[in-house]
Amino acid sequence: MKKLLPLCCWHSWLLLFYCDFQVRGAHTRSHVHPGFEVLASASHYWPLENVDGIHELQETTGASRTHNLTVLPSHNSTFVYTNDSAYSNFSATVDIVEGKVNKGIYLKEGKGVTFLYYRKNKTSCISNPAQCGPEGVSFSFFWKTQGEQSTSIPSAYGGQVISNGFKVCSRGGKGSVELYTHNKSVTWEASFSPPGHYWTHVLFTWKSEEGLKVYVNGTLRTSDPSGKASPAYGESNDNLVLDLTKSYENRAFDEFIIWERALTPDEIAMYFTAAIGEQLSLSSTPPSFSVTPTVNTMAPTNAYHPIITNLTEERKNFRRPGVVLSYLQNMSLSLPNKSLSEETAFNLTKTFLNTVGEVLRLPSWTAVSEDSAVVPGLIDTIDTVMSHITYNLQASKPQVAIVGSSSMADFSVAKVLPKTMNSSHYRFPARGQNYIEIPHEAFHSQAWTTIVGLLYHSVHYYLSNIQPASTKIAEAANYKNCLLSATSYLISLEVSPTPKLSQNLSGSPLITVHLRHHLTQRQYTEATNESNRIFLYCAFLDFSSGEGIWSNQGCALTEGNLSYSICRCTHLTNFAILMQVVPLELTRGHQVALSSISYIGCSLSVLCLAITLVTFAVLSSVSTIRNQRYHIHANLSCAVLVAQVLLLISFRFEPGTAPCQVLAMLLHYFFLSAFAWMLVEGLHLYSMVIKVFGSEDSKHRYYYGIGWGFPLLICIISIVFAMDSYGTSKNCWLSLGNGAIWAFVAPALFIIVVNIGILIAVTRVISQISAENYKIHGDPSAFKLTAKAVAVLLPILGTSWVFGVLAVNNQAMVFQYMFAILNSLQGFFIFLFHCLLNSEVRAAFKHKTKVWSLTSSSSRQANVKPFSSDIMNGTRPATGSTRLSPWDKSSHSGHRVDLSAV
């Protein structure tokens, strides 16, 4: 702290000096800094640091008020030496307040609580700001991150300041102030960057008609002018407490001051400059102010060297992005207000940006995109440093420009007189496909104009997973579950005074932003997927609320495609192209229609498949039904039946539950088994029609291994490696997000391709036979054989699933309906073509009926001759000549292909 000249030391010295001046009268008022008068008007003051006895608990009897400062009688005064000031050594007498617990302000510590503020009325202006009247109230303190508590400096440690009326806290890399009025039940809240390793001054004011304002290091950072209704306040403390939170880092407080009125911006500026030991020059138009250096106007490069060196050394200890951000923010606020030569400004800019670039490459930053506040906060800090450099850049000629490149960004720092600009526009960068252009007519000021340009090289990689609800992009908020991500470089341009631009996007002049897209592999895959809609937004980081929020207000995308975007904007700031990928969703009408088709079709299929299995079981004694072809039909029917029953049941379970997860595993197995048996159907058809090989018995065990064993193996592997992918998304099925769905899609696509090939080959053979039959017999019905064969084979080969591949977007809606109809009715078509309309099944059923009839009559007439054993064995009895069907004619024609398999 001594090394860096902390702000709190100046504050302590100034207050002690002023108290000594009032008590002893050793000086004249003409030499007093105007900030002393602001300090003297305070209602209460606690030094907290470097004050012996501050941790002792004492009774406050006979407390008196002197010079508007809360003090004790002189015999309780504490004599303080402040000998660590970089400017001079002084000693003075300061009186502090100490008293009973439950009466005011406290320090929370491991050994207990130290009393600091005594007030008989618990509903005071401090504990309830509504009691302050129209004058309002102001609270001021210094705050910083403290790594380890020092035993030699009894600072007040804590992570928050709380009372019954307000709370100041720092959590997760974000500072905030909350203020509550009990009579109207209204809460005011404002956020700001929390302190880091440097002392940071926080001052906030509140007035009923102005609301809450938060000043950090003398500058207004954020505000809440209106507040919001709040029936209950989260904390309940009649006293003011400096609290030690459970955060991983400690924070130290110093110089706590209360004014029972709202300070003006000028008063805040005077007080802050007095605290840091600078002279104040007030302008005629408050609240702006400038700090006038007390030394020569030119500062050598080494005036900034300690800060850069310290940053380079400290980054070795950085592990968490929030800590890094706090450190950089406080470093940016501690830069000296000294003039910079061009060489010094260039070295400082490049060193700072290179250092930040090295910090971004730390392993802890790989997941920083999950924290939406860290990267915008870092960008805001960089803007602060660059603005400081530009403001202090010494202009020795009408145009001063510093242009360079670092590992972090390309940069341009310029200070120019607009009248010396000869071109029709100002462009940054001067070359390349990523740039911002400002028309010359927008530069209306005749005074010095500062321009800061930054083109970040890799920050866009960290601008992903942006929640639409946390942005000001209304269009993106319509798809709250679809995250935003940057697809271009982040480019920044700041001009002061602000250019005069049209406030209407249809007017002129406007800013032109041209950005090339740099898509990751994942972004490109999603953008080119026809099942997704892509939205591109010209967005910028809006820091008006104290934190960076993405917005597209005042910007419009005028031209572009997947490679680039051109935007027109009414303002300057940090720009990037954000992409939002929205999966295509069906309208409510289509969803209801497709769901109804699925329910009705699956229910009908379940009934038909059950009838089919019962029919095959009853007719299993007939030889024509007992062959391998009908065994395969029965196994396929069983797999499809169980899969569709489970599918209907799964609609009743909530995703993410254990039953839903179990159902997803069973659905995976039985649907995969259904596809496997479709493959068996194709292989068996190929062996019977195209290439006859082996006996049925030799292939039997292979078919069962393919139909039931292979799907089981795939499911076991999938469950072992992707257990969490089952039943966790929108339904009881495999997750689409992590690739687990390919454990079903890949085998299914393979089977569809194989079966389509088999279907084509079989269709060619049938077509040849049909043509031959037409030539020999002249039967025109033979041409119908091809169409009939295809219709019969489609349900058992599963080729109708190809419509699922074609149904990828709203433009292919007809394929979605075809897919829903054909696949939900797969069981019905199996029953129709391979049971109800199948000539062999009908013949077997007739024979079985005759057997039942003869068996029944034989029990009544013993002399009735039993039915032929051939019929019992399933062989066809000799019958009279019948007209040959086209298929029978084909066998008589001498063709060696057996089409009974079809």
From Swiss-Prot:
Cell inner membrane recorded as keyword: no
Quaternary structure (record): Heterodimer of 2 chains generated by proteolytic processing; the large extracellular N-terminal fragment and the membrane-bound C-terminal fragment predominantly remain associated and non-covalently linked. Interacts with ESYT1; interaction takes place in absence of cytosolic calcium and inhibits the G protein-coupled receptor activity of ADGRD1.
Protein name: Adhesion G-protein coupled receptor D1
Signal peptide feature range: 1-25
Stretches of the chain found on the membrane's Cytoplasmic side: 620-630, 683-702, 761-788, 834-902
Biased composition (Polar residues): 870-884
Residues with attached carbohydrate: 68, 76, 83, 89, 121, 183, 217, 310, 330, 337, 347, 422, 504, 529, 561
Topology of this chain in the membrane: Multi-pass membrane protein
Molecular-function GO term, any one: G protein-coupled receptor activity
Biased composition (Basic and acidic residues): 889-902
Keywords: Cell membrane, Disulfide bond, Glycoprotein, Membrane, Signal, Transmembrane, Transmembrane helix
Pfam families in the cross-refs: 7tm_2, GPS, Laminin_G_3
Alphabetical list of PANTHER family matching this protein: ADHESION G-PROTEIN COUPLED RECEPTOR, ADHESION G-PROTEIN COUPLED RECEPTOR D1
